[in-house]
UniProtKB/Swiss-Prot annotation:
Name of the protein in question: UPF0178 protein PBPRA1738
NCBIfam families: PRK00124.1 (NF001095)
Family: Belongs to the UPF0178 family.
Source organism phylogeny: Bacteria, Pseudomonadati, Pseudomonadota, Gammaproteobacteria, Vibrionales
The organism's place on the tree of life at top rank: Bacteria
Length: 150
């Protein structure tokens, strides 16, 4: 098992949490992005740069992640595809997507996209706060206790 990170949009504070977890637990963390991502020197952390382009990083993650792996992403369509493939998906706010919740998220995403295309200003998600960071760290720890065996 390893952790994959959709790193193009992943907040730095979440990456820092993942770096600490990788070294503490000994799990491989791979950040995938279409630009260079600086990572600390560690045998448990690596960065993969893919070509720039729409969904290139997402496609790489889908191709490389194996059932049982965990992907950190806020990309709902990516999370849906991963869950279908038996891969776990956790967003940077600490929500572990499931087969049940991902469908609801997709419907809401599509609804908001329809609203935006009709001219309604919907705004984006609020900034990540301390509670979100703590929730992410807690959910990640809980997930790893249940699923990661050295």
């Amino acid at each position: 098992m390893q952790i994959w990170v959709d790193a193009d949009a992943c907040p730095n504070v979440i990456k820092e949490i993942l770096f600490r977890v990788a070294n503490r637990v000994g799990i491989m963390v791979t950040l995938v992005a279409n630009h260079h991502i600086r990572v600390p020197p560690s045998p448990h952390i690596r960065s993969t740069q893919v070509l720039a382009g729409f969904d290139v990083a997402d496609d790489h993650i889908v191709q490389q992640a194996e059932p049982g792996d965990l992907v950190i992403t806020a990309d709902i369509p990516l999370a849906d595809e991963l869950i279908t493939n038996g891969v776990h998906a956790l967003n940077p706010r600490g929500e572990l997507y499931t087969k049940d919740t991902i469908k609801q998220r997709l419907q809401m995403r599509d609804f908001m996209e329809t609203m935006r295309s009709s001219g309604v200003q919907t705004g984006g998600p609020p900034p990540l706060n301390q509670g979100d960071r703590q929730n992410f760290a807690n959910k990640l720890d809980t997930f790893l206790v249940k699923n990661f065996k050295k």
